[in-house]
């Protein structure tokens, strides 16, 4: 985080004026294994323009995400537009220094600057695109990490996408 950021414990009245690009959301902060994670929901139009993805195919030295699959994103958008359907799982993000992410414990307010590339998508790029392409303007459940370097973001992406166990085919047949 930028050294210009006020402390998360600093009272709001002592914080410097924020610019018109500042966004504030009610959030819950947890500290897990040395990492701060903030859980909230953000309207897609406040999230999508300020998020970015480091794709391996576009940047082999620093990228770690899969190639964008428009068909998959459109399928998600169609699903989200269907009455009674929802996606409860969150999109995992990493606040970049430019986001100037701050959290006020007393009011449970999470703030970040609306600037390009403020939030790196660690997991959920196709869900994010699906929300963006959907004709309905949903609020998106997110988990936002702060203070991660790019190597940690990549490791977290790999952990999320390789260490979970899929549902056995037999169980899928029974549930359907």
Which residues make up each language-model segment?
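N-terminal extension/subdomain marker
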Residues: 1-88, 97-102
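Basic- and aromatic-enriched surface patches that contact anionic nucleotides/nucleic acids
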Residues: 3-11, 65, 84-89, 93, ...
């Amino acid at each position: 985080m930028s050294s210009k950021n006020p402390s998360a414990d600093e009272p709001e009245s002592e914080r410097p004026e924020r610019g018109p690009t500042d966004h504030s959301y009610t959030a819950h902060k947890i500290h897990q294994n040395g990492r701060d994670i903030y859980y909230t929901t953000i309207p897609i139009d406040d999230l999508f323009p300020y998020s970015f993805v480091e794709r391996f195919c576009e940047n082999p030295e620093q990228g770690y995400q899969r190639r964008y699959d428009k068909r998959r994103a459109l399928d998600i958008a169609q699903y989200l537009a269907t009455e009674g359907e929802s996606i409860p799982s969150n999109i995992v993000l990493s606040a970049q220094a430019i986001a100037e992410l701050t959290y006020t414990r007393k009011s449970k307010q999470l703030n970040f600057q609306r600037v390009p590339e403020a939030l790196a998508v660690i997991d959920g790029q196709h869900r994010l695109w699906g929300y963006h392409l959907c004709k309905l303007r949903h609020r998106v459940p997110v988990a936002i990490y702060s203070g991660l370097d790019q190597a940690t973001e990549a490791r977290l992406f790999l952990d999320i996408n390789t260490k979970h166990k899929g549902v056995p085919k037999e169980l899928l047949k029974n549930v359907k």
